[in-house]
Amino acid sequence: MVSCSDKLTTSKAEKLIAEKLKEKPVEKYVTLKTGEISLFGYNEMRKADIYEKLQKEGLITFIKKEGLYEYRCSINLTGKGKKYVVDTKKIDRMPYTENKIKSYSITLDKVEEIHLIPMMNAAEVLTSFKVEKTPFVALEDQATLSAIGEGDYVSKKIEFIQLENKG
């Protein structure tokens, strides 16, 4: 991020971050196939547990038929689950539809601290973000789940660079 004034304050940092988030919101999505689906292999088959959890929450219907190396299943969104759908695409010649579903979004909570680095005309800002998760966040990969954590907040360091000739 770029700061144009000579002293970066908490309120200035929050304003700059909020402007950037307004310009480019942080919203993440997962794809959920609905209709008749086959799940192959360990990674796909482990999703069956997630689908069962989403069904218990009333977000989808999930019917599975176990095979030796695959699950054949039927997945459909309920009215409650459809509230999270952003886009739907019917796949030609396939017995399923791909649904783009909101997984989580991140908004600014607060700037926790600012560490100025005068020799580099820079600052390191420790920032807290609120993570608003939907129930479909469970479909994210393990790396994403680790990055956003289990709680409602995540901290991140952001570097600011002062541009003397711009303001």
Report residues per predicted region.
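Short, non-transmembrane alpha-helical segments in secretory-pathway proteins
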Residues: T9-Y29, D87-T97
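Basic amphipathic alpha-helical segments that dock to polyanions
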Residues: M45-I63, G67
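Short beta-strand edge/turn micro-motifs at domain boundaries
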Residues: T61, E124-L126, V131-E132, A138-L139, ...
